[in-house]
């Protein structure tokens, strides 16, 4: 028998989410009692096992803030300049600080037009007015309304209440409520401005009790980099990013690995590398804290069709997880998740968390443009291997940067739209609810037990059809089971 026939006979069988179900077990566990927190690196623990994808129609700072507030993690995409990505990370970090230290200020002799420019640029509604390092006023968008051309000192509020650095949350909140103010400048013993407390930050800290924060009380955030862009990684690290995610279509590229090892030595942030689908890759990526699994499972990815390469996602996750366990690495399943049940399956197959693109691309916080088609709202969504994303700068992810002409790109993704799905909070509520339900059926009190107790059954095509609603015309669409198929 020839070696090529032997290749086929030795080929393993690959399974994806629709090919398997989890077998229900005897249990005393109820969904409301399960713990869905997970660790994705030695220093980063999430309260829900979900990350948003590093895609230019999925994650920018608004998505990252929303994800962290719900207990997950946003990975800001790299299809932008270094300075812009650094600023996006800083925006997330500023979103809920008790005391904002790097305060944007303005001088009293500046124009209100410049004040408005600063507010728009930094996504804020007001500015302390500072002269000789002392606070002399506060100016807000409300003060400026329709008063272009005037000076800040003409419109600012001059009677400013300040507080010391030792202020506690409850005391700051009480002062702001009693005085009906939205901002409290923080000063040192010499009266020098050292920070700012805002009402929106205090309210957010109380509202989002499941949020994930660092030791300074700031929201967690991750950012993507090319395996060769060491300068970007260093700048993001300086900006306080919690996790660097090396974002490439094929992380088992030996040139990329050499560069990633050098990068790892130059940053303090935790380090995730992806994507891979072969357990052998783990042996060469042990310098990472976690690996990201998925070659071509995404709804907008054409790698498997264009390149003929990939491993069905459940099998890929299981193979990589077995090897990663030997080195103490964490595993993130990236791509192919369509329903909450797929999250349950991915974790039972060995993942510590999942990364979502499609399911979050239709949310309010996603940066994709809204479009109306036949009276229904959609949001644009594209793969980072699509022609549009490559032209914007994402070609390097597929090792097509630099030497390729635009007209000669070989795309590995498509561009399209997905239905508008509401807010990130609403979508995650349904997804986490489904995860908890699955854990209840399996008898898993936490993510670790789901990995240990989850037992799979392989199903046929008829079994897949039986699993979905059938023999009925659905008249009321469920929030976790969309009727619109693409």
Curated annotation (Swiss-Prot):
Which pairs of Cys residues are joined through disulfide bonds in the record? none
Supply the InterPro entries for this chain: Aldolase_TIM, CBS_dom, CBS_dom_sf, IMP_DH, IMP_DH/GMP_Rdtase_CS, IMP_DH_GMPRt
Cofactor(s) named in the record: K(+)
GO MF term list: IMP dehydrogenase activity; metal ion binding; nucleotide binding
> What regulation of activity is recorded for this protein?
Mycophenolic acid (MPA) is a non-competitive inhibitor that prevents formation of the closed enzyme conformation by binding to the same site as the amobile flap. In contrast, mizoribine monophosphate (MZP) is a competitive inhibitor that induces the closed conformation. MPA is a potent inhibitor of mammalian IMPDHs but a poor inhibitor of the bacterial enzymes. MZP is a more potent inhibitor of bacterial IMPDH.
Q: Where does NAD(+) bind?
A: 247, 294-296
One GO process term, biological-process aspect: GMP biosynthetic process
Q: What is its EC number?
A: 1.1.1.205
Stretches assigned to the CBS domain: 99-154, 156-215
Give the gene that encodes this protein.
guaB
User: This protein is called what?
Assistant: Inosine-5'-monophosphate dehydrogenase
According to UniProt, the reaction catalysed is: IMP + NAD(+) + H2O = XMP + NADH + H(+)
Enzyme category, top tier: oxidoreductase
Write down the HAMAP family for this protein, in alphabetical order: IMPDH (MF_01964)
Q: Which SUPFAM superfamilies match?
A: CBS-domain pair, Inosine monophosphate dehydrogenase (IMPDH)
**What does the annotation say about its assembly with partners?**
Homotetramer.
Residues annotated to bind K(+): 296, 298, 301, 466-468
């Amino acid at each position: 028998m020839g070696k090529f026939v032997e290749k086929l006979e030795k080929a393993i069988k690959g399974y994806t989410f629709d090919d398997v179900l989890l077998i229900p077990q005897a249990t005393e566990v109820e969904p409301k009692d399960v713990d869905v927190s997970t660790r994705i690196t030695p220093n980063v623990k999430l309260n829900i096992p979900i990350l948003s994808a590093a895609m230019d129609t999925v994650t920018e700072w608004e998505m990252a803030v929303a994800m962290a507030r719900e207990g997950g993690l946003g990975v800001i995409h790299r299809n932008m300049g270094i300075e812009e990505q650094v600023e996006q990370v800083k925006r997330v970090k500023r979103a809920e600080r008790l005391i904002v230290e790097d305060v944007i200020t303005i001088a009293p002799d500046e124009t209100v037009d410049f004040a408005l420019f600063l507010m728009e640029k930094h996504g804020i509604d007001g500015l302390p007015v500072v002269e000789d390092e002392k606070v002399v006023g506060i100016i807000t968008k409300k003060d400026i309304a329709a008063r272009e051309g005037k000076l800040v000192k003409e419109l600012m509020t001059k009677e400013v209440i300040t507080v010391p650095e030792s202020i506690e949350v409850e005391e700051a909140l009480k002062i702001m409520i009693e005085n009906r103010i939205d901002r409290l400048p923080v000063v040192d013993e010499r009266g020098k401005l050292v920070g700012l407390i805002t009402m929106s930050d205090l309210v957010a800290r109380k509202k989002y009790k499941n949020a994930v924060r660092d030791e300074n009380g700031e929201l967690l955030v991750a950012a993507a980099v090319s395996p060769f862009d060491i300068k970007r990684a260093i700048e993001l690290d300086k900006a306080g990013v919690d996790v660097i995610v090396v974002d490439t279509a094929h992380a088992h590229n030996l040139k990329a690995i050499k560069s990633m090892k050098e990068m790892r030595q130059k940053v303090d942030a935790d380090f995730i590398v992806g994507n891979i689908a072969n357990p052998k890759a783990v042996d060469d990526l042990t310098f990472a804290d976690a690996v990201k699994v998925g070659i071509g499972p995404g709804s907008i990815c054409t790698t498997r069709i264009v390149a003929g390469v990939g491993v069905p996602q459940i099998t890929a996750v299981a193979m990589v997880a077995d090897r990663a366990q030997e080195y103490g690495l964490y595993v993130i399943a990236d791509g192919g998740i369509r329903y909450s049940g797929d999250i349950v399956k991915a974790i039972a197959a060995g993942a510590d968390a999942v990364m979502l693109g499609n399911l979050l691309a239709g949310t309010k916080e996603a940066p994709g443009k809204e479009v109306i088609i036949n009276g229904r709202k959609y949001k644009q969504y594209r793969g980072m291997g699509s022609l549009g994303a490559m032209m914007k700068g994402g070609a390097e992810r597929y090792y097509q940067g630099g030497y390729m002409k635009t007209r000669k790109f070989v795309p590995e993704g498509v561009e399209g739209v997905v239905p508008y799905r509401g807010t990130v909070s609403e979508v995650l509520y349904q997804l986490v609810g489904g995860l908890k339900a699955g854990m209840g059926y399996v008898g898993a009190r936490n993510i670790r037990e789901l990995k240990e107790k989850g037992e799979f059954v392989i199903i046929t095509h008829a079994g897949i059809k039986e699993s979905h609603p059938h023999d009925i015309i659905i008249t009321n669409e469920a929030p976790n089971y969309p009727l619109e198929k693409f």
